[in-house]
């Protein structure tokens, strides 16, 4: 389990969110069988999403989704996080890999390639606010800082790091976001800039000094004051960070309705049932022939649970209007239920 800290620095001129996510990223690596550089890419994005959730989400039931689409061999990635420290994510090509950079570091930018970052903020009402910005470097941290400035008008410094060892297991992972508050004094910004230039890198600091030590180095001379989270029920004064998926057997079984009855019967004949793998977390669900044959014509959004297709009392099927769900996901219905041209 990881952890998230919040606080202020520079006598309130800087808002700070920091996360230690080593266990979270390692679980993602194991679940998806990620290559070392894919681990770094997804790990940075997951950590960044946790930081943005603390900075941007206004109510507990909101969620933030990062979608990175690039031309590199990774093929893109998707990450979702909430304000409670829950995060999940996946990459399109988990075993994709590229050579190390000349300095010996993982080349996340080349693995991601050129492209765009899309950020969705999903509200409890079903509304979704979406912003898209071009990728600056594909290294994730710079791209998130660029997004915060371009789309949210929030000048920020974002540091993200994932270090792997041995066969690719995660040695340390974490991140820090420093938001400049309106009216921040010039001397505070100058000190922050000087501290950033003097940093040896986030991952060496996390490995040698831990999260608190990294914050001390980054905010030296700026008087970091940690926010007391105990009033919110976090008795350790930190928010636990966990890899947590919202999939379950019911949702997995519903996914089979996207196959025709003939295709589902073929699964039963050839495989003795059906198997569904969650793309978010890699969880495998296996279903018996009886469970597969029990399917009714009902389709829900895999992300928010909204009914896309369901039987009415007269035996006809009711379909959702439009091509986009209220959460922003593209509506995909089984071929046999789509209106014929």
Curated annotation (Swiss-Prot):
For molecular function, the Gene Ontology terms on record are: protein folding chaperone; unfolded protein binding
CC per GO annotation: cytoplasm
Q: Keywords on this record? A: Chaperone, Cytoplasm, Disulfide bond, Redox-active center, Zinc
Q: Among its keywords, does the record have RNA-binding?
A: no
The answer, when asked if NADP is one of the entry's keywords, is no
Q: Which Gene3D superfamilies match?
A: Hsp33 domain, HSP33 redox switch-like
Task: Describe the PTM.
Answer: Under oxidizing conditions two disulfide bonds are formed involving the reactive cysteines. Under reducing conditions zinc is bound to the reactive cysteines and the protein is inactive.
Q: Where in the cell is it found?
A: Cytoplasm
Which cysteine pairs are joined by S-S bonds? Answer: 245-247, 278-281
GO BP terms: namely: protein refolding
Q: Which InterPro entries does this entry report, sorted A to Z?
A: Heat_shock_Hsp33, Heat_shock_Hsp33_C, Heat_shock_Hsp33_N
HAMAP family in UniProt = HslO
Which NCBIfam families is this protein grouped with? PRK00114.1
What functional role does this protein have? Redox regulated molecular chaperone. Protects both thermally unfolding and oxidatively damaged proteins from irreversible aggregation. Plays an important role in the bacterial defense system toward oxidative stress.
Which family is annotated? Belongs to the HSP33 family.
User: Matching PANTHER family, A to Z?
Assistant: 33 KDA CHAPERONIN
Any idea what this protein is called? 33 kDa chaperonin
Name the species this protein comes from.
Answer: Thermus thermophilus (strain ATCC 27634 / DSM 579 / HB8)
The gene for this chain is hslO
């Amino acid at each position: 389990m990881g952890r998230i800290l919040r606080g202020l620095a520079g006598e309130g001129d800087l808002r700070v969110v920091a996360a230690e996510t080593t266990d979270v990223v390692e679980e993602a690596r194991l679940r998806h069988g990620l290559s070392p550089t894919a681990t770094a890419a997804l790990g940075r994005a997951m950590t960044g999403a946790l930081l943005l959730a603390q900075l941007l989400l206004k109510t507990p039931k909101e969620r933030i989704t990062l979608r990175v689409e690039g031309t590199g061999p990774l093929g893109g990635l998707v990450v979702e996080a909430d304000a409670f420290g829950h995060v999940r994510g996946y990459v399109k090509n988990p075993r994709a890999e590229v050579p190390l950079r000349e300095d010996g570091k993982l080349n996340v930018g080349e693995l991601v390639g050129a492209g765009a970052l899309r950020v969705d903020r999903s509200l409890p009402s079903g509304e979704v606010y979406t912003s898209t910005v071009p990728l600056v470097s594909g290294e994730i941290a710079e791209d998130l800082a660029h997004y915060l400035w371009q789309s949210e008008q929030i000048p920020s410094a974002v540091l993200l790091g994932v270090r792997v060892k041995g066969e690719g297991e995660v040695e340390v992972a974490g991140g820090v976001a420093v938001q400049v508050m309106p009216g921040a004094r010039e001397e505070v910004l100058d000190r922050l800039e000087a501290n950033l230039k003097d940093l040896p890198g986030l991952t060496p600091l996390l490995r040698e000094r831990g999260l608190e030590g990294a914050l001390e180095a980054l905010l030296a001379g700026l008087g970091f004051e940690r926010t007391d989270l105990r009033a919110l029920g976090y008795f350790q004064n930190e928010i636990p960070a966990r890899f947590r998926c919202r999939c379950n057997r019911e949702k997995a079984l519903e996914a089979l309705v996207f196959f025709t009855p003939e295709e589902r019967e073929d699964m039963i004949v050839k495989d003795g049932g059906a198997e569904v793998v969650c793309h978010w977390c890699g969880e495998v669900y296996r279903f018996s022939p009886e469970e597969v044959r029990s399917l009714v014509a009902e389709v829900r959004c895999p992300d928010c649970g909204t009914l896309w297709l369901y039987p009415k009392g007269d035996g006809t099927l009711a379909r959702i209007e439009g091509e986009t769900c209220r959460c922003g996901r593209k509506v995909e219905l089984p071929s046999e239920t789509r209106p014929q041209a």
